[in-house]
Amino acid sequence: MTLRRASGCRQLTLTIGLALTLGLLQWPIGDVRGQDGASPAQVLQELLTRYGDNASISVPQLRSLLVRLNGGQSEDHDSKTQPTRTNASKCLAADTLAVYGMSEQSRIDERGLQQICPTMIQQLDSQACKTQPNQESESSPRPTEAEVWGYGLLCVTVISLCSLVGASVVPFMRKTFYKRLLLYFIALAIGTLYSNALFQLIPEAFGFDPMEDYYVPKSAVVFGGFYLFFFTEKILKMILKPKDTGGHGHGHSHFPAERYANSNGDLEDGVMEKLQNGEAGGAALPRAEADGRGVGEDDKMLSTGQTVQDTQSSGGGGTGGCYWLKGRAYSDIGTLAWMITLSDGLHNFIDGLAIGASFTASVFQGISTSVAILCEEFPHELGDFVILLNAGMSIQQALFFNFLSACCCYLGMGFGILAGNNFSPNWIFALAGGMFLYIALADMFPEMNEVSREEEEAGGSGFLLTFALQNAGLLTGFAIMLVLTIYSGQIQLG
């Protein structure tokens, strides 16, 4: 009886204190001062300074404060009042935050803290933020500055090194397995980019938490609809192929058969037109062998660095600059090469922006975004390397400018971290999600179809192998992002 009476007195004291706090916070800021000389604005500022940072408090920080306040009164309660795990998961839930126009990534200032104060009292009274004994808070703390910059620099460095892989695969570019390997990596990039946008970036932009809002199954169904139509289209194309051999190809054919009978000059113009339309990539090189070019011309274009450099030096002479960058004069290099370099620099800057903002939210989010970008950059950089060679650069020049554009990712990462620390990163997640969807569906998906077009037209075992590689890449990328999303709460680094 004494225990219950003491518990009731403590609860009454807490209620009175919270009521007084509510009255103080609801008073117009700056109009009056309290008995101790501190105005309501100063009280709010002290709370934000003590429990938040940068004159604001994040939702996880506010939730931790409520858990701390609610946990302090639970030791003397009997077992009947112990909250369940479900109550703990509803502390400042997404629908509650939405009433105030907030999300999981929002930063709450003085005015916002004053407005949300009634809900804070309701959460404390209902013990929605009370944890079970020996149970840690559900919300994981934000990464430290060292973790954000350390993991960010590491991931961006690994991604940037992909730009140097192009030179190592030059001797194998005319091999059959190179084309099939490239096809798998393109499909893998589509799967990771599309799934990362569905599972993480777009939900993060809306403030959803995969552990609380249970959106993952619905996102998986969205991918299932995409994959179902892809699978059905390929099967129908294989079944109905005999009907298409008479010249009645379906309306999505991008390259009529007459183009492949043109001269080498017309073919080169077609490739350049395709590159300028944004459908460039690893498909440009494997098509060279199928389009009827002579072996000698292919060997000259895809031989070792010395062959390319010698050929260019004999035609245009050295640049007169750095010896390591010796090759054709910059004024003689095709305009397409500079367009590709500049567009790649902008592309990599946005990639870095997404990586930096993701790491400010959580280490898991940053790693997931980096994995998706890495899978996309690998085949993308290989294709860019070939484009720069075809435009007239030497291997040394192509490596240098490809790596230079890749380094723009560092600049984007820095801006992303600064924006994520001082502003809500939800807008960056929304921008990155749209970009990932476009790259996957409008850029790399047509590229994958173009790489596999020759095998599909031939039919037989070649078509089945190509179809298997496409499915393996798509499903592998989907599985990687699905596993990372489901087990995000168990991923702990550092």
UniProtKB/Swiss-Prot annotation:
It catalyses: Zn(2+)(out) + 2 hydrogencarbonate(out) = Zn(2+)(in) + 2 hydrogencarbonate(in); Mn(2+)(out) + 2 hydrogencarbonate(out) = Mn(2+)(in) + 2 hydrogencarbonate(in); Fe(2+)(out) + 2 hydrogencarbonate(out) = Fe(2+)(in) + 2 hydrogencarbonate(in); Cd(2+)(out) + 2 hydrogencarbonate(out) = Cd(2+)(in) + 2 hydrogencarbonate(in). InterPro entries: ZIP, ZIP_Transporter. The chain crosses the membrane at residues 153-173, 182-202, 220-240, 398-418, 427-447, 463-483. It is found in: Cell membrane; Apical cell membrane; Basolateral cell membrane; Early endosome membrane. Residues 35-152, 203-219, 419-426, 484-494 are extracellular. Residues 174-181, 241-397, 448-462 are cytoplasmic. Belongs to the ZIP transporter (TC 2.A.5) family. This is Metal cation symporter ZIP14.
